[in-house]
Amino acid sequence: MPATSRRRGARSAVPRVLTGTVYVTRQVHFNAAHRLYNPARSRAWNERQYGLCANPRGHGHNYLLEVTVRGEPDPATGYVLDLGELKRILQRTILDPCDHRNLNEEVRFLRGIIPSTENLVLAFWGRIAPEVPPPAVL
């Protein structure tokens, strides 16, 4: 009998395919400084609106960014998206340009934007979403 023969009743090596939509989240950390200030408004308005966050010298944060992709796992890999690939996308689109930078002054894609949490989410989404390969969706 050849060494590669299968035992009687043994199952094939083809994996079972599970179906359904899943959500997979990756977290990344970065540090950055920013200033909340609307140049179209007065200094007094900015100080009332943003308080210490309007400090002319800015202030810093330790950011935690969570990115979730949605989709059905690929039957061949079991992945919605290889998390290593998502990590590379986040490194290239967010961490490399933003980590240890002044978001108002040093990050080109944030210039002219008030870097509130809400605006950062929108700006980051705009950079990450086009990089996520289908069928995964941000």
Whereabouts are the PLM-identified features?
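Charge-rich, low-complexity N-terminal segments
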Residues: 2-138
